[in-house]
């Protein structure tokens, strides 16, 4: 580094880095800093190069760790950066490319060093390196600066206050990355951290007043999806001056500095993937999720979560309730549009879940939208391609549907939205179908996939809960959706019979041999019977509440009437079978009277006529099916590892050695 283009492999031998990490103290006013920060660094373009950068940084850090307690050079570098950021806003307004470029380079070095420090040492050691203060002879003051706190406040100020221009885009991304790196101490602990330097600095003291402004800025960065400026927008004039400063950065920018924005961290995702078309938006979203999922401090709730829970629409002129901390306003229409467009990434789906679950203002706004298909369709597409998604992404998508189906208005309106030609649904050509029927099809497909592959009870529960919430409001079900409901019941029935047979054989086997351990078929039977009962309750709920709206379901029920015969006298299902049995018997009688060889159209006509004559008072009333999503106790045990796995896999230009990661296993999704 310094006044030449640098290559990763040369970093440990670089004279400027050697001096920085050496035994000589460097004053913050030394011309050395201008030389160190005037580098054209071809930024890593693959995970291999990011790994090389990490290894080179470790080499420099070893010397720095050894010498910094005596030299204080890390503190001097940070002070140089802090002093420069005071003029950054003015430099942006004056288009001072050189000043911004050097300030960015200072932050880039700090970020690289901080990342290794956090991985390699305890929080106590880290703080010692950031609180060094040179004392003159006879000065016994114990007041030392806390440069880590100053750095964090400065980063928050930079992120929130510096205008986003072509020349400031890069330093804005670097500031967000450095905050992510500061929080990354969680990666190196198996247990969720409940007390750390993150809590110390970000939840109290001078950083706290920036909370709402930071959350708002990160959300707007996500909303705007600003792309990095083209290479030509950031070219510096070539000068050959005797001072050795390198002002000719054109080649470095074109081939290097901007390419950092096409990286996806480990695995190096291709630049064309949607979440990386805007590195600033991607990095902002990851930082926002990390902040929102920090555990509460011992003496105060997480202020970033408070901000996310309470912000309002810019169109809402009502006053904020008293005692609401960190409140702000944001354009809900823009946020809704961005959320609809970005659902291909885990992190955008997790943000949608977080907002729907925690912010009642957002939830009310979304449920009142007349274009809910723009939000629901991307969620259904995630579930449809379940085999290509990780299980966490599928869970989030399902829970979003469950939260939406808690609202009766949503359950009614989705059957009024008619869709044409759903191209991603490949099992059958759907030229025209309601959003409600499509939702049913996709959820049932997810259940069937789970039954044959993952066999996850939690997934089953959420799918069935969403269907149950909707069931009383089923309207004009598409014939294919009606068929799939009964087909799922058929599949469950076959599975029940198979497990019952296995249980019987197992019981016989246990009587003849006491030595061999046998599978717990009784538990399997119990689970499958719970699911069957739930399906019967869903069918019953539709028949008792909206029979006249669903001739296709009655048709499918009659077509497969034999399926239900075995459950009529079963003690677990007798009560719920009464209404289904009544409907089957009533309409079967009508069809019998109409004669044989009836066309599909004629059968549907008889069903529609029969609905009017069916004595509704004979249908037994059951409690309304209503399920509400409730987060499990200690949700942070799920969400914190999940969020950090997203950072690990998706953060732009950040690499961590997988062998150092303690929070989650590398093969987990």
From Swiss-Prot:
The keyword Cytoplasm applies. Its main location: cytoplasm. It is a lipid-anchor. It is found in: Cytoplasm; Golgi apparatus; Membrane. The keyword Endoplasmic reticulum does not apply. Coiled coil: none annotated. Keywords: Cytoplasm, Golgi apparatus, Lipoprotein, Membrane, Myristate. GO terms for biological process: bone development; Golgi organization. One of its GO terms (cellular component) is Golgi apparatus. Pfam families: Dymeclin. It comes from the Eukaryota. Myristoylated in vitro; myristoylation is not essential for protein targeting to Golgi compartment. InterPro entries: Dymeclin. A lipid is attached at residue 2 (N-myristoyl glycine). Belongs to the dymeclin family. Interacts with GOLM1 and PPIB. Necessary for correct organization of Golgi apparatus. Involved in bone development. This is Dymeclin. It comes from Pongo abelii.
